[in-house]
Amino acid sequence: MAAPVVTMHQLIEAGAHFGHQTHRWNPRMKPYIFGARNGIHILDLSQTVPLMARALEFISATVQAGGKVLFVGTKRQAQEPIAQAARASGQHYVNHRWLGGMLTNWKTISGSIKRFKALEEQLAGDTAGLTKKEVLQLTRERDKFELSLGGIRDMGGIPDVMFVIDANKEELAIKEANVLGIPVVAILDSNVSPEGIAFPIPANDDASRAIRLYCEAVAAAATKGGRDAALASGADLGAMAEPLAEEAAEV
């Protein structure tokens, strides 16, 4: 069965066709711009739909093959949808701040994750031998780790594909992915460059409703990949098979 798709109607309803003011555009996005209206660039959704479908198929196939997806979106309106989508699909995310070397210096990051997990175990266990001040310090350290590493604590290595909201804001994350040869799927507004993006998706990257639509679509594609892998392995999925057969292609 094909991966979930996002329709033209859904994109228009979410305001995905609205780019930025024309004077803020990046000329490299010209091939994806339909025109301008009242000083605002209008993105060409007739390209967005097939490009989105292509990206979702790739994500689904990657997960089916045992790959991991890293959702990245640290701007305010993307933080919650990014985390929810990653959790719902059993994937991983960064939604607070991208730490330099998060992928290219994975060995150091892995050490920090070990410390994070050790803190969680310590605080969940018997803290009777610690002073209130010591418990507070450990709690603050754990909370700091939760913000920066909570979404990748169980990733276990670099991801196989990265999904990005706002390529400008997440420039460092994209550069690290490029260095490591990790394919990047990114929502590209009219003010960004498509350079370094393996799967460009021209669409508004600011509207909350649109961001949620993209995140849910990627989560659905990743979930489908996981289910297909389980079915292919001959796992007994019980009642899962019936809903799968009836699942609509549309998100």
Swiss-Prot record:
Name the InterPro entries on file. Ribosomal_uS2, Ribosomal_uS2_bac/mit/plastid, Ribosomal_uS2_CS, Ribosomal_uS2_flav_dom_sf
Cellular component GO terms held in the UniProt record: cytosolic small ribosomal subunit
Q: Which UniProt keywords apply?
A: Ribonucleoprotein, Ribosomal protein
MF (Gene Ontology)? structural constituent of ribosome
The family database entries (PROSITE patterns) matched by this protein are listed as: RIBOSOMAL_S2_1, RIBOSOMAL_S2_2
UniProt family annotation: Belongs to the universal ribosomal protein uS2 family.
Q: What is this protein called?
A: Small ribosomal subunit protein uS2
> Per the UniProt entry, what species is this protein from, by scientific name?
Novosphingobium aromaticivorans (strain ATCC 700278 / DSM 12444 / CCUG 56034 / CIP 105152 / NBRC 16084 / F199)
